[in-house]
Amino acid sequence: MTSGLEETVRAFFADWTTRDPDVLVSYFAPDAEWSEANRAPARGHKEIRSVLELQVGFGSGFEFEFRTIGSFGSIVFTERIDRFIINGRPMVVPVAGLLEFDESGKIRAWRDYYDWSALERQLIESGVDMSGADDA
């Protein structure tokens, strides 16, 4: 049995196909925080939207395979395989993530954990200039 928050998470990831940062940021609480393996956390709608805009502008063909999804209270855990295309090359990233929700059903915190060095290798192989990437 899935919770309503699990369905919200599935809808959020499905909406990455829109490549619309405004659609995606609408899932977040105004004071939300999003952190990933390779960069400082983005805080609030403005910073989160900026990162979303960069990511959807940089990649395409977003697909998210849920290996495991579960919830406890206001927290949803995901074990995923994230797939997307950069410079015509497929990227495949195993991810473990936690999404915390506020009382109104908006994402309050999103933390994704993955092997940054494995993704970085894929990005370099696709021709992405990674100079300065470790400064994030």
Where are these regions (language model features)?
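A beta-strand edge to alpha-helix "cap/lid" segment located at domain peripheries
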Residues: 1, 53-136
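Short, low-complexity N-terminal intrinsically disordered segments enriched in polar/charged residues
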Residues: 1-26, 30, 127-136
